[in-house]
Amino acid sequence: MGIRSLTRIEAERRSALVTVERYDVDIDLTALPNGPEIRCVSTVTFTCSEPGAETFVDCAAEVRSATLNGTALTPGDDGRIPLPGLAARNVLRVESLQADTTTSPGAHKAVDPADGEVYLWTSFEPDEARFVWACFDQPDLKAPHAFTVTAPAAWTVLSNSGDPRVEEQGAARRWSFPDTPPLSVYNTVVNAGPFHEIRREAGGHDLGVFARRSLAEVLERDADEIFTLTGQGLAFFAEAFAMPFPQRKYDQVFMPEFGGAMENYGCVTWSDMFLRRATPTHAERELLAVVLLHEMAHMWFGNIVTMRWWDDLWLNEAFAEFACHWAAEGATRYTDVWAGHLAGGKLRAYLSDQGPVSHPIHQPIHDVAQAASIFDSITYPKGASVLQQLMTYVGEDRFRTGMAAYFARHAWGTTTLQDLIDALAEAGDRDLATWRKAWLETAGTDRFTLEHDGSTVILVADGTPRPQVLAVGAYDRTGDALERAALVRVEVSEPRTPVTGLPATSDLLLINDDDLTFATTRPDPAGRDTLFRVAARLPTAISRGVAVATVWDMLTAGEATAAEAGRCLTAVLAAETSDAVIEPFLTLVTNIAELWAPDADRPALTEAVAGVCLQLADDPGRRQVALRGLARTATAEGLARLRDQADDDVDLRWRALVREAELGGDVTAESAALLERDPDPDAWVRALTVRAAVPDPAAKAETWQRLAVDRTVPVQSVGAVAAAFWRPGQDALLAPYAERYLAEIPRLDQGGMIPAMVYTSQLFPPYAIDSAYVERAQQAVQEAAPVVRNTLLERSDTVRRMLRARAVNA
């Protein structure tokens, strides 16, 4: 029958019937060093509001035995165990076995190639706990959880509540954790392995960071910064939400073969790729800060107060994404973080919101499978931008007051959208009903331009705009720079809005200056070429970012060429002063050269990017970022210079080898030698990335087998290997793999939500295809799992836009 996805109707019925008193979960990990198995005994104590009724518990692991109030149960073949004849108070006991900890969702066994040590992580969002132990796997059935874990004696076991009682049992130890506060099942966690551990005190909290032993040196390097950011974040959110984090212990665990990061209460799990093997760049450090604060914000948005159902996923993710930037700007050294957000996530969101899978931030969700498909750029960066706009709309002080009231009112419970809107409306003294409908329940992006009506400037919307506040900046040329002569904020609710207070004449008028709202913009027709020409002369990272966002949106909409956009971006890079945006802008312009430019224009644009990299490399603070960019764009002659600059930098040498391999150089011996001396336990992935770039049939076949078929590449490295595999100018070699991608579609959802998203998007071919292929792919995915379908539709729409741009002459 297959594993069924929980529907909203089923969840509402079960929630009305069942109140969970507690979970007692006994987990046995002792088989993992030599095998794949996890054994669990889940005891669920719950009450029933209608004695005699029936329901079901979720368990997609192998059920060894199940009893309800002492009576044996028969599991179904759909990932559920029927629970007939419920009593007023019930005790359910289920013994289960998870025999696949390699590809199954929920729990994963990773073996460190450096020393053979084994590590185990769990990750349960949105409904993957059921693959490990029996539970009511829906967010509104919150309850205390008590975990007892038996593990090899050399291992440390970590869970939500910290401070376990540890008992020696010969070759094993038994870890008994105190009860958690009431949590949704998906917020719980067990991580285990022979960790390297570092602890600090900060603000009354006991902070811990953990990593596999082979990364101990890297963890020690980054520990001070991680602890500093953690202390800053806990203090900021405690004040902003008028509620300190209520648990003394706060752990962060960096795990191998983990995708992204997960906000488990009191015990955040990270991909250990965030522990950069090379010295981190500014953008990489800023990303670490943003992700750290994002997961921390979830302690309040998601853990302490939880969405009732997945249609309010944005209550978790959009708020966490907004709050992490808010906190980073207000409490850490990353004060240009909103500029980084604009240069990265917000640009992706603009593109996604104008594509085939655009959806309202808040929308009806039929079942959890559909919910897995909206962990996307609409929910995250668009949602964060909309909330930034809301704070501007109601005022930051009133926004804080509303947040404090929301948490005081709903702590340890579940909420809906209306609960939050009510709290903010009361605090802000604004009717937010219209705002809610326009921003949260309506898909799409507003677009603004300007008209001059005699002496008046009119802000013109493409249709009826959402209620919002935005700004128009007026700039005049002073020497080689532009200086802001005026900034006028306007509250918009009509298609045409007069903008008063601007100078009679200006060299440039910039719509959405200060980036206060989520909207695309267009210069007036007379100012189009001026914007492209003078964007680099704007005085701040945000103003330059707003100009770049306009140029990018025009490229993706077919209103600007790749050559125009590339010239504008390289000029901005040459003048940029903010480290927060140099790396994302460099990535963006390199992608334009590789993926958007016609074949005839690509060499010149690539050479221009390489030239700005060489210019940036003269600044010692930007040398590393610039040389990484050069490694993507250098010609054979440029690679020689890069080698001289790289010295003993192993990371740069790997990057140079990838480029040299793509250009046809014989790098086999050098790659093998570098692999021998690279201390990174995952260096074999770097060697495979070099192999992936080689324009040779055997190299492509080997890479595809390991990447797409065997899936031996850690999920967090799939993107890098796939990018080296799909290279411009290799169409004849790559064409067969475009067809093989289509054949892989039925199994792209294997392993859970994160692998499904990664494999679907990163393996989609950007080369060796045409628009007819895009249509075939979109048809082929219609019956796939929702997360695969939506990810493919979004990625294929972007590639379709690339194909259109490549067909346009400069």
Features from the language model and the residues they span:
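Charged, low-complexity, helix-prone segments enriched in Lys/Glu/Asp/Gln
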Residues: R14-I27, P144-H145, A223, A327, ...
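Non-catalytic accessory/interaction domains
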Residues: T67-L68, T148-A151, R213, A297, ...
